[in-house]
Curated annotation (Swiss-Prot):
CDD domains linked: YlxS_C
Name recorded for this polypeptide: Ribosome maturation factor RimP
Primary role: Required for maturation of 30S ribosomal subunits.
Gene that specifies this protein: rimP
Superkingdom classification of source: Bacteria
Coiled-coil ranges (or none): none
Organism: Anoxybacillus flavithermus (strain DSM 21510 / WK1)
Main location: cytoplasm
Amino acid sequence: MKKVTHIVEELVTPIVTHMGLELVDIEYVKEGKNWFLRVFIDSPTGIDIDQCGVVSEQLSEKLDEIDPIPHNYFLEVSSPGAERPLKKARDFERAVGKNVYVKTYEPIDGQKEFEGLLTAFDGQTVTVEVKVKTKKKTITIPYEKVASARLAVIFS
């Protein structure tokens, strides 16, 4: 049996592609007593509430047709926000030159969390320039060791 997120991805991808948008992420989570199906969309120029509404309506119709979720849930369609997740290689490629927060599966140079400027991504390694006190240090992280990553808003 397919996971709910895979089914939703198959349903929503043609909708967002037709609208010239990008599917960023899908979450299906239980919070308290309620289930939430969250779909995050974006475009190079950003998205607006009307685009979210259209995607929500069209996806809701498709979900009603096949009914893959056996209980009540809330459908939310939105932008991924300023600290959008970096999930795919193309996300990292687009984020070069931006501030990021990266968690790794195992320690690299004695730590598992890094925040700084993403200076390079070659498909195999993620290179982040971090500040250590008053100096800058370059950390090279093997791509397969990245547990999670997102854009980071850094206040100086």
